[in-house]
């Protein structure tokens, strides 16, 4: 084996072992202190829920914060293909590929397609302590696949990925340090947004960085070893190889597009005001929104105020609507039909309803599931 390659293998093995050891040890201590819930108790309010995450820039980061990383992944793949035939850029080909693979494999496959789907950790807003319906699970505690997609944080990976620019240390230490700072800073911002929105714990964000770092180490030291390509000369590529590369790149671009489309953040808010007749003696809500998603407040208002927030992930062009209709029976029962409708594909959707009702209906309110 080439001594240089052997050296990379050894360095990679040591770094990966240390990296995972630090992450596992820190997580054990973190869980012991119950730090995830301690922090979230300072953010969540029984009265206002996760309202801190509704403001800016947190909403903007949730809806659009992943776009820069997706765009750079596209550009890196195309740059890698062009660099294969460019004497000026040939030495950077493995660097371009390193970024692309770290993004596609680390963020796309390991985090979003594997860990989030199969670890079964409920999001903070889904656990009983914070107004949800499920049992809390600590980081690295496996749950029921599909019952929660909190671990790790997908949005956070799209911030931390920029730290992979540290690979340019041999060419420009300032660029490498700047990229590292950008990645850690942007990843922290994305993490804060998701924390305030009740979508993730601190440990979810911590492990997003952990997975991205481990993926980067594996590709850098065991697979690509970019510095060894600095002296490589441009070689003529056969038409057959070109077509294979084009097909491979196209497949990767399709994969990126699918991952982006199905993990595209979605948020919609509806408010409905329902007038209540003086003859109304009882309110019957007939709805397809589960009872555990309703937060009812009896206040000094003259009418019924309904606020519904729908958030999750949706395919482009998908949308959400809310139909509300009323009917007063001769017995004084006002039936309010609340029908939540989705159009398109939603890999994940959470609905939360805040209902303000006149005090006179405090013991005269019932909820009936809407028949399928």
Residue locations for each model-derived region?
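Membrane-interface loops
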Residues: 38, 87, 91-181
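Alpha-helical membrane-inserting segments
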Residues: 25, 29, 74-78, 105, ...
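N-terminal transmembrane-helix/juxtamembrane module of multi-pass inner/ER membrane proteins
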Residues: 2-76, 116-123, 128, 133-135, ...
């Amino acid at each position: 084996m080439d001594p240089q390659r052997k050296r990379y293998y050894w360095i990679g093995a040591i770094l990966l072992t240390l990296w995972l050891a630090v992450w596992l040890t820190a997580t054990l201590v973190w869980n012991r202190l119950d730090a995830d819930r301690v922090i979230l108790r300072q953010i969540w309010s029984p009265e206002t829920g996760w309202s801190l995450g509704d403001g800016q820039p947190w909403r903007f980061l949730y809806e659009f914060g992943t776009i820069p990383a997706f765009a750079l992944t596209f550009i890196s793949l195309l740059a890698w293909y062009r660099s294969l035939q460019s004497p000026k850029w040939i030495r950077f080909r493995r660097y371009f590929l390193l970024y692309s693979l770290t993004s596609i494999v680390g963020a796309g496959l390991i985090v979003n397609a594997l860990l989030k789907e199969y670890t079964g950790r409920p999001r903070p807003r889904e656990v009983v302590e914070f107004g949800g319906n499920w049992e809390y699970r600590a980081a690295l505690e496996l749950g029921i696949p599909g019952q929660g997609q909190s671990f790790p944080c997908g949005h956070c990976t799209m911030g931390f990925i920029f730290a992979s620019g540290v690979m340019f240390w041999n060419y420009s230490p300032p660029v490498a340090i700047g990229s590292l700072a950008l990645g850690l800073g942007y990843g922290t911002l994305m993490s804060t947004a998701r924390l305030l929105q009740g979508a993730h714990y601190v440990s979810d964000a911590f492990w997003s960085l952990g997975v991205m770092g481990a993926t980067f180490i594996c590709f850098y030291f065991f697979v690509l070893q970019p510095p060894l390509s600095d002296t490589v000369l441009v070689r003529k590529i056969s038409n057959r190889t070109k077509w294979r590369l084009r097909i491979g790149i196209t497949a990767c671009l399709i994969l990126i597009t699918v991952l982006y489309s199905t993990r595209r953040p979605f948020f919609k808010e509806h408010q409905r005001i329902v007038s209540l007749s003086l003859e109304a003696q009882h309110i019957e809500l007939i709805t397809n929104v589960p009872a555990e998603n309703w937060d009812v407040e009896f206040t000094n208002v003259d009418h019924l105020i309904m606020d519904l927030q729908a958030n999750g992930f949706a395919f482009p062009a998908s949308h959400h609507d809310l139909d509300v209709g009323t009917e007063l029976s001769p017995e004084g029962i006002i039936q309010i039909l609340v029908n939540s409708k989705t159009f398109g594909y939603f890999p994940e959707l959470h609905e939360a309803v805040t209902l303000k009702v006149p005090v006179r209906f405090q013991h005269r309110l019932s909820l009936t599931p809407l028949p399928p």
